[in-house]
């Protein structure tokens, strides 16, 4: 019976450790999800700002005349 009790205790300890690990991982997932949501919001703001910027008056590089040679 001693061996059975030890095996049960070992399983209980492993289960407790796994529960703690799962809780830690769950908290990390929550933090990463919050971070991702914040980054998505920042990206949406940046896209909106970029879309509202007027195009530059500079010509495209392909439209530019070649520089004078020295």
Swiss-Prot record:
InterPro entries: SlyX
Highest taxon above the source species: Bacteria
Pfam families: SlyX
Family to which the UniProt record says this protein belongs: Belongs to the SlyX family.
This protein's name: Protein SlyX homolog
Organism encoding this protein: Shewanella sediminis (strain HAW-EB3)
């Amino acid at each position: 019976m001693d061996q059975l009790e030890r095996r049960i205790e070992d399983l209980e300890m492993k289960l407790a450790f796994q529960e703690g690990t799962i809780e830690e991982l769950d908290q990390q997932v929550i933090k990463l999800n919050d971070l991702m949501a914040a980054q998505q919001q920042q990206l949406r703001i940046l896209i909106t700002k970029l879309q509202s910027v007027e195009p530059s008056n500079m010509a495209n590089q392909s439209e530019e005349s070649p520089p004078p040679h020295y």
